[in-house]
């Protein structure tokens, strides 16, 4: 009897171990520190080759972690950039916190200031940005009332960014001029629209690769919401996704959403938590997929850059 009890308990233990195996993290993989000695890392973004760019914001520089595993400086100074995102043309969009602007940076590191205010009022401080993928739409006949016909054409998607208020010691500006909102910048890079006005402190933001859904974290209220994106960038069908806010966000090939703060919390598309990734830092700011195969999860956390090998991979919209 004692033998059978021991056998049964052993089988239970094995079953528990198997049940605990992650469906998204590569077998045997652990969080590895790739680089350190930074002041505060933020805004990781992956280019088309798989290189990951991130900011060391207090030191006013953008760094590059190459696919070959080497660290280099891409831009210094960089307007104290925070959140970053690449567009399809290879430009790097940056939330330039020094003067509360939105920048577009070319491959040589030359920046263009795209936005610096909204209807004459200064932004609080653009924080995180997501570039909506281009989408295909059928052309129309000469009559606007006719249904779409003919070949499909590619339509640029524009971009969304959050604008919370975090007072910086280096600001020389006056007091806060606007509420903390979320904005949509149309593909002409001139027309900007306020699309979310009812959140306490919007921060992390990410969308799906088909450009249909947008996730926005209200870090001030400790919640994350999901919205449906209309063709003109307007948002509808607001729905609570999970009871957790986030500093930064990304999405994987299975539609799972990654939230940051105390480590990395992963939720499936239904909003159920499926994984908690512990990071040996006081605060985890942001996250993205990178590498040649997009199967390395890059984590910017306080003084370090970390990596974790995954089973799932990143998508173009992350």
Specify the residue positions occupied by each region the protein language model found.
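Bacterial N-terminal signal peptides
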Residues: 6-16
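Positively charged n-region of N-terminal signal peptides that target proteins for export
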Residues: 1-5
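Sequence-structural signature of mature extracellular/luminal beta-sheet repeat domains
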Residues: 18-318
């Amino acid at each position: 009897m004692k033998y059978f009890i021991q056998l049964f308990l052993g089988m239970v233990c094995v079953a528990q171990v198997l049940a605990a195996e992650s469906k998204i993290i590569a077998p045997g993989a652990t969080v590895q520190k790739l680089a350190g000695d930074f002041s505060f890392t933020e805004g990781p973004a992956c280019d088309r080759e798989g290189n990951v760019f991130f900011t060391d914001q207090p030191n006013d520089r953008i760094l590059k972690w190459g696919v070959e595993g080497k660290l280099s400086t891409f831009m210094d100074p960089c307007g104290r950039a925070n959140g970053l995102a690449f567009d399809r043309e290879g430009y790097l969009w940056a939330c330039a916190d020094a003067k509360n602007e939105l920048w577009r940076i070319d491959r040589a590191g030359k920046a263009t200031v795209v936005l610096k205010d909204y209807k004459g009022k200064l932004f609080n401080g653009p924080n995180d940005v997501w570039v909506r993928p281009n989408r295909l739409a059928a052309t129309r006949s000469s009559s606007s009332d006719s249904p779409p016909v003919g070949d499909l054409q590619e339509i640029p998607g524009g971009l969304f960014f959050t604008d919370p208020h975090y007072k910086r010691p280096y600001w020389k500006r006056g007091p806060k001029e606007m509420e903390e909102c979320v904005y949509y910048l149309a593909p002409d890079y001139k027309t900007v629209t306020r699309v979310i006005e009812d959140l306490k402190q919007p921060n992390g933001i990410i969308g799906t690769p088909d450009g249909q859904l947008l996730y926005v974290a209200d870090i001030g209220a400790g919640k994350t919401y999901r919205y449906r994106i209309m063709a003109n960038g307007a948002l509808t069908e607001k729905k609570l996704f999970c009871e957790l806010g986030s500093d930064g966000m990304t999405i994987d090939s299975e539609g799972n959403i990654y939230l940051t703060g105390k480590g990395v919390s992963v939720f499936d598309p239904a909003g159920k938590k499926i994984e908690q990734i512990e990071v040996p830092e006081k605060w985890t700011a942001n996250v993205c997929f990178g590498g040649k195969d997009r199967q390395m999860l890059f984590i910017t956390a306080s003084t370090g850059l970390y990596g974790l090998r995954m089973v799932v991979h990143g998508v173009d919209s992350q």
